[in-house]
Amino acid sequence: MHVIKFSSEDCGTCHRMSHYDAKVAEELGCTFVSVMLQDTEAYRKYRKILLKQYPNKEGMGWPTYLLVTDPDGDFTIHAELKGGMQQGAFRTKLADLLPS
């Protein structure tokens, strides 16, 4: 499972969560991908995934995490987490979304 984080350079909550989100995702056996909306190359690569979930970007949280299989191919979005949260809550919510 890939955890793709969509965030923005000017989002303070996104920056605070960057201190632990990748580590937590990897500890839970996921591949973590961070996509800053200002990073043109990364955004172009994962844009189709974001727009499938949020066609006009309304309702996104900052940050938004999408749990995806086959992100480079015929991807499937399995779940999402959005908005800021502490490390323990992030770990619990992410673990609850992963298949057993």
Residue ranges of each PLM-predicted region?
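Non-catalytic, surface beta->alpha helical segment in thiol-disulfide oxidoreductase systems
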Residues: 60-100
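Thiol-based oxidoreductase modules, predominantly thioredoxin-like and allied folds used
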Residues: 6-7, 28-48
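A generic structural signal for solvent-exposed, polar alpha-helical segments
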Residues: 12, 26, 38, 68-71, ...
